Structure formats: C-alpha cells, structure tokens
Amino acid sequence: MKYLIVNADDFGLTKGVNKGVVECYKNGILRSTSIMCNMPYAHEALEIKELCPDLGFGIHITLDAGKPLSSPEKVNTLVDERGYFKRGFPHSLDDADVDQIRIEIEEQIKKAFSLGVTITHMDSHHHAQSHPRVIDVFIEMAYKYNLPVRSTPLDREIIIKAGLKTVDNFIYNFYDEGVKKENLLSILGSLKEGITEIMSHPAYVDDELMNISSYNTKREIERTILTDKDVLQFILDNNILLANYSILK
C-alpha cells in the first residue's frame, strides 16, 4: 500500500498559515501539520482540530525564529541581545550549549502537549534536528515522549540507527522553485510502497506573513495546488491513502 502524509510546517506562525492548513485539509490532500509552539497562533490548535477531526498535529521544534519559550537567561547561548533566537541557521547553533538546547526543546514539547490536541510526531524548523548539537537531544526527547519523527536526508541514517519510528520516504522538493502542479503530480506518480511524507507550507498570505517570512507568496501557490481537483483525482485513481503520523504510533 501507498500511504501519503502531506504535512504543513509552520502551524501557528500567522492566522493566514492556520487558515491555509484548514483549507488544504477540508478541500485538499493535507492531513498533518506541525506546530511552532513559540509562535502567537499555536493556541488555535484545539479550535482547528474541532474543524478538522482527522488532522494530525506534530511539534515543529524551532530554534532559529522568534523567541524561546524558556527565559533568555536559561538559554543565553541560543539568543541575541534582544532575547530572540539567533538567525542564520545552521551557524547560529554552532556555539549553542547542548543543555540549553535540551531545555528549550522540552519546553516546546510541553507546550504542545498543553494545547489540548493529541501530538502525533516531531520535526523541526529548517531541519534544525540535523545539527550536530541538536540531533542527540532530538532523539532523546523523541524517546522520552514516545514520538515518531520526520527523518531527512541529513539525519535519516542516525534516526534509523536509533530505532525511532519514522516514515519510509521523505519528499522535500515541493518547495520554492518546485512548487508546481506538474511537479507534485510527478512526485505522486513515483510514490513508493510504504509511508511517504511530503513537506509543505501552504497559507493565505497576509501582511503579517510578508513581514516575518521570506518564504511567502509561494505558500499561496502551494495552497492552490494542494486543493487542485486534478491532484485530488490522482490520489483517488491511484489508491493512495492519505494519513498522518498517527499511523506510526
């Protein structure tokens, strides 16, 4: 069987992102999202779960955008003089203290579990989990909280070796220049047996998103493609089963 998890990263970043997640669930092929727990609209998770009962919610561990959930004094190697996460991943974490990384990751996990939705998995913003200072803590926390994880080409080998539950295939090229309907149809046409995740970032683009994210207008295009009737029909015609990470629990 071919199982497909289309996951929307960045839930909670803006209202427009959350609205895009709902749209792609109700009228498209999206069945999973991951929450940026340090962002202002993360709290909408429960409300949106009620609108989208089969939507899975994961944790989008964030170490290079916005402010930490921990007090800046506790994670001073992660933040700048204003108390925001240092920008410029991966080098922004090169001098980060591993114990401070652990503190912040666990704060974000605890926040996710407090939102009132079942947490299906864990992944990370800009694939921060793959950083040498992060990967061991990421694995440790996945074990501690019994969470399946996304595995990327940068960290798949170590995640598999650690014995964590993860997808069989991870597709990351439906992004930026790859945000084209024909590209998504090609990806769907070459799906392998097992469980595949396609990373996505759909949204309704508003001023708030334009001001805080350099990846903006393409999110609107992603949204229209993920709800396209030809894409929906392809899924039906090829017996692809839409899922979220709870399939791995």
Curated annotation (Swiss-Prot):
CDD domains named among the record's database cross-references: YdjC_EF3048_like
InterPro entries cross-referenced by the UniProt entry: COD_ChbG_bac, Glyco_hydro/deAcase_b/a-brl, YdjC-like
Name of this protein: Carbohydrate deacetylase
Organism of this sequence: Thermoanaerobacter sp. (strain X514)
Cofactors named for this entry: Mg(2+)
Keywords of the record: Carbohydrate metabolism, Hydrolase, Magnesium, Metal-binding
Binding site for Mg(2+): H60, H125
EC number in record: 3.5.1.-
A Gene Ontology molecular function term of the record: deacetylase activity
BP terms from Gene Ontology: polysaccharide catabolic process
Top EC class of this enzyme: hydrolase
Purpose: Probably catalyzes the deacetylation of acetylated carbohydrates an important step in the degradation of oligosaccharides.
Quaternary structure note: Homodimer.
Family: Belongs to the YdjC deacetylase family.
Origin organism lineage: Bacteria, Bacillati, Bacillota, Clostridia, Thermoanaerobacterales
A Pfam family it matches: YdjC
SUPFAM superfamilies: Glycoside hydrolase/deacetylase
Gene3D superfamilies reported in the protein's UniProt record: Glycoside hydrolase/deacetylase
